[in-house]
Regions:
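Beta-strand/loop-rich accessory regions of lumenal/periplasmic or secreted enzymes
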Residues: 262-266, 296-602
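Carbohydrate-binding surfaces of carbohydrate-active enzymes
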Residues: 115-337, 433
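Substrate-binding/catalytic cleft of secreted carbohydrate-active enzymes
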Residues: 1-173, 177
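Active-site-proximal structural scaffolding
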Residues: 11, 15, 38, 89, ...
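Short beta-turn/strand-loop junction motif enriched in small, turn-promoting residues
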Residues: 100, 112-113, 219-221, 412, ...
Length: 602
């Protein structure tokens, strides 16, 4: 427990007087104040929202200077103070606010924990924040409304002297009140599970997985690990092969031990080690999974296209190719699969086509969060236009091995160069899809999208889950075999945005109640990400509230992504996605997957 002298209130002699008054009441506690520029009042070096380079300087106790931008920001709300090498003496580093969890956010959270554990002078930090703020109302038809800012300010005057972060144009911070790891209705956001995993007080590390040797680290201050039950299980593609429990592990607080797990590795395997409570504790039920870690002991098996002796026929005219098999007809036009008739039934509501846009997250919107009327002019909408304007320059068709037909297409797409698509059609109806390109600007996503019948509601996948994950927020999403519905895949934030992605997927089924649908398989060792929902991406992006999402029961949108930009979270309401998690300009993107039609069960 520490004394706090307040928050974001500037600096001055009043804080010295406050400290003296507090010491007179209790002189046994340390003091915290982030706005202390000369560090005469605070017993810790307190920072808000440090970026990766600032974290490294803080950990290495290096001087920190501030820029002109920092000086300007300091006049508004920030406290980005300079730090000299001498100031580190006897003062640990504490992040009084970090990991800004503004709706679909909290990216690279695990990277912060890695820094906390790497540097001895790091105390940790406080996530901003715990719960969204919104007002609940019921519409006349009973629909739940979660309202914010401008929903209540139609009569309020707009003042010319309002600060930018109170938005003179709108009179409020609008949805900037949605920063929690749980929702205003106390439903859990996906980032909650990321926090739960990253903050887990027990960690298992591989020593020699081939022989079953692992190190268990106890990060708890007062509890021996023998109070928990250690469980392990081995799976192949989500199918359980072996499982067991260890005898209680004697590992005192802040220590580590080596354990041996009694498994064999004759097949492609993945291992999960977990620790669970053995009795009910305050706030925790007996059997609650306290901590877990996963290890890929062997790579996933690769899909093998079944050889089929059937014949394919095709007709090629310009940028249009029609392919006929025994029970299907597939048409490619202008780089898109525009028709796919299987067993006499059209499977596509809208084409299988390249996709580069996502419904903008709060962090994607960046500084325009402070000026909402200008969001529609955001440069990232250029990717939406690029997606609409992509077209084929040249289409080449050739007969491939095993009676296949290969279609190679050179595409022209704004913001991309060297844009190439290959479709390979097998006699049994399977479709191999390959796409490569080099972005001229950082991308939101590099993938394909197809619109299927709304009856395609049932989902089964092997990948990370069960909740949504992104390339910079997937530590807390375990690899496994999951099943759900398209409706349940959706996660709702207060302001609708990209939200339902599942990363590191190797195998996906999307079917109706009769088993008709599609299977998607990763090709070689590169998994894909997917999302599915009963509305369009553009409709999601236009909605300002949950109740405004234009649900359409007649369609299911399926996204199959080779890459998607992370969600970020280093800075409040700003992109700041770290370099490893971007889809970076100038770096070639490529991926492949296999689409297989699933027929109705007989």
């Amino acid at each position: 427990f520490m004394w706090s002298l307040g928050n974001e209130a500037g600096d001055g002699t009043a804080f010295t007087a406050m400290k003296q008054a507090a010491l007179a009441l209790d002189d046994t506690r340390q003091f915290h104040y982030e706005g202390d520029f000369d560090l005469t009042k605070s017993d810790v070096i307190s920072r808000m929202y440090p970026t990766a380079d600032v974290m490294e300087k803080l950990g290495k106790k290096e001087p920190i200077t501030i820029s002109l931008y920092d000086n300007i920001a300091n006049q508004l709300a920030a406290d980005s103070k300079p730090i000299t090498a001498e100031m580190y003496e006897g003062k640990p580093v504490l992040l009084c606010e970090y990991a800004h969890s503004m709706e679909n956010s909290l990216g690279n959270f695990a990277d912060y924990m890695a820094d906390f554990e790497k540097y001895d002078n790091m105390c940790g930090g406080f996530i901003w924040d715990f719960v969204d703020q919104a007002l609940h109302r019921k519409a006349q038809d009973g629909t739940d409304l979660w309202l914010y800012g401008t929903d209540f300010e139609k009569e309020e005057p707009r003042h010319w002297y309002s600060l930018p972060n109170t938005t003179a144009i709108t009179g409020s911070n609008t949805y900037f009140c949605a920063n929690g790891i749980i929702g205003a209705d106390r439903t859990v956001h996906p980032q909650y599970y990321e926090v739960q995993k990253v903050y887990a007080p027990v960690q298992t590390l591989a020593v020699n997985p081939d022989s079953g040797s692992f190190t268990v680290k106890n990060k708890m201050l007062f509890t021996n690990i023998n109070a928990l039950e250690c469980r392990w299980q081995i799976e192949v593609g989500g199918r359980l092969l072996m499982h067991g429990k260890l005898e209680p592990i004697d590992c005192p607080p802040l220590s580590e031990v080596t354990v041996s797990l009694p498994y064999t590795m004759d097949q492609v395997t993945g291992l999960t080690v977990s620790f669970a409570t053995t009795r009910a504790l305050p706030g925790l039920a007996s059997g609650f999974t306290f901590a877990w870690d996963q290890f890929v002991l062997r790579p996933m098996p690769q899909p093998v296209a079944e050889k089929d002796g059937g014949d394919l026929h095709y007709d090629h005219r310009g940028n249009r190719v029609e392919v006929q098999g025994a029970d299907f007809d597939l048409t490619i036009q202008n780089g898109r699969v525009v028709s796919w008739v299987i067993d006499g039934s059209q499977r596509l509501v809208a084409p299988l086509e390249p996709a580069y846009f996502r419904a903008l997250t709060d962090n994607d919107i960046d500084f325009l969060n402070f000026v909402p009327p200008l969001i529609k002019f955001h440069p990232l909408y250029g990717w939406r236009r690029a997606q609409r304007r992509t077209h084929a320059l040249r289409t080449v068709v050739q007969a491939g091995a095993d009676n296949t037909v290969e279609v190679h297409i050179a595409m022209s797409t704004p913001r991309l160069r060297e844009d190439l698509i290959t479709y390979k059609i097998y006699p049994n109806g399977r479709l191999y899809v390959y796409h490569s390109a080099v972005p001229k600007q950082d991308m939101l996503r590099f993938g394909f999208q197809m619109t299927l019948p709304g009856s395609y509601e049932y989902v089964n996948w092997y990948g990370r889950g069960p909740h949504p994950s992104y390339r910079d927020r997937k530590t807390g999403a375990a690899l496994g075999r999951y099943q759900s519905t398209v409706t349940a895949l959706e996660h709702r934030y207060m302001r609708p945005q990209e939200s339902s992605n599942r990363t590191d997927t190797y195998d996906l089924y999307l079917c109706d109640s009769h088993g008709e649908g599609f299977r998607v398989q990763a090709y070689y060792e590169t998994p894909f990400a997917f999302s599915a929902y009963h509305y369009t991406t553009m409709g999601l992006d236009k909605a300002a509230h949950i109740h405004e999402i234009p649900y359409d029961p007649s369609l299911t949108t399926l996204n199959i992504d080779g890459a998607q930009c992370g969600v970020g979270g280093d800075l409040p309401g700003q992109g700041a996605v770290r370099a490893p998690y971007r889809v970076t300009a100038g770096e070639k993107c490529s991926y492949a997957f296999i689409l297989e039609p699933m027929h109705k069960k007989k």
